[in-house]
Design a protein with these regions (language model features):
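Short, solvent-exposed loop/turn and secondary-structure capping segments
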Residues: 49, 68, 100-105, 167-169
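Short, acidic/turn-prone active-site loops that include or flank metal/cofactor-
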Residues: 274-276, 295-299
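Active-site-adjacent beta->alpha loops and helix N-cap segments on the catalytic face
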Residues: 276-286
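Glycine-enriched alpha-helix->loop->beta-strand junction motifs that scaffold or abut catalytic
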Residues: 262-268, 285-292
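Bacterial Sec-dependent N-terminal signal peptides
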Residues: 1-25
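Polyanionic/metal-chelating signatures
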Residues: 140-269, 277
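Histidine-rich, glycine-flanked metal-binding segment
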Residues: 21-23, 28-29, 34, 43, ...
């Protein structure tokens, strides 16, 4: 039975491997990059574009050409894929791959009103937009293998805790080092209405979470116009404004809540849905939010 190739060319095609290392190499540096040519394949480029009897050329870790008729480089290793398909990989846009999960502190019967964090940060522990996933990312070979078996080639990973959660990183699922797997260190901002592991008393309700988000945006706007103090949380809100904004909702009712925040502060949100959007489909559609929808296939 012919080996069927699942090539992750949607990722490799825009990811360039630099010839210069940023860390020491034990032994002789290997600069040779083998060339693999896959011929006679049905290549799916996008939902609306495909090539029959196509040829795909890979040099090292980078796709250098895809077409129906290409000149094959001398010395290339040729793979005849007649009858086989080559697809782009999936990308998980809502993952915490390679990151440690946030942990709750020890229980105390006394209510906590002040933040226990030290430093020039926001006064509420659930607001931490300064968190940068790329600074905490560690390649996880076991988890990566599970992803790869299901057709994923990359993930957008962030710390899934808090209300303003910080930035996520776009990373490859290879066994290589963190230096090579991180494609975009800061790829998106993440939000939710859940306070997460914070033990502070506030916010204690959904209304409180909404108020805290609005107040944070207003404070960040004020902060941008002053130079008397430093607040790393407000600075992160302002510095990362141009990134995509992904908001995780708890249920279908949250769409209207996020919509009001988006209108007030002129923010374009992408919604990470929960699969219950069908119950208020007209209201959800009216927001015109791009939505990341979970898939749950039946067990075969």
């Amino acid at each position: 039975m012919r080996l069927r190739f699942a090539l992750l060319f949607s990722i490799l095609s825009f990811y360039t491997i630099s010839g210069q290392e940023t860390f020491t190499v034990n032994g002789v540096v290997q600069n040779f990059k083998p060339i693999h040519v896959f011929t006679n394949a049905h290549i799916i480029l996008s939902p609306t574009s495909e090539i029959e009897n196509g040829t795909l050329i890979i040099k090292g870790d980078k796709i250098i050409a895809v077409d129906t008729s290409l000149d094959i480089p001398s010395g290339a290793i040729i793979h005849d894929l007649k009858g086989d398909y080559i697809y782009p990989s999936f990308i998980d846009l809502y993952s915490d791959y390679g990151l440690q999960k946030a942990k709750k502190g020890q229980y105390s019967y006394r209510p906590q009103y002040e933040s226990s964090r030290t430093g020039a940060y926001h006064w509420n522990e659930a607001i931490h937009p300064e968190i940068d996933a790329s600074r905490e990312f560690v390649t996880d070979k076991e988890s990566a293998t599970a992803y790869l078996k299901n057709g994923f080639g990359a993930v957008l990973s962030h710390v899934q805790d808090g209300i303003l959660r910080g930035t996520g990183s776009l990373v490859l699922l290879s066994e290589k080092s963190e230096h090579e797997n991180i494609i975009l260190p800061k790829a998106a901002n993440y939000f939710s209405f859940k306070k997460g592991v914070s033990k502070q008393k506030n916010p204690s309700s959904l209304m409180g979470s909404i108020a805290l988000i609005r107040q944070t945006f207003l404070d960040a706007e004020w902060y941008s116009a002053q130079d008397n103090q430093t607040n790393l949380s407000y600075a992160a809100v302002n510095n990362n404004q141009e990134l995509p904004n992904i908001f995780a909702v708890n249920d279908e009712l949250d769409y209207s809540r996020v919509y009001k925040i988006a209108n007030e502060f002129e923010i374009d949100f992408i919604i990470k849905g929960n699969g219950k959007e069908y119950s208020r489909i007209d209201e959800v559609a009216a927001t015109e939010f791009p939505i990341i929808i979970p898939l749950n296939f039946p067990i075969l």
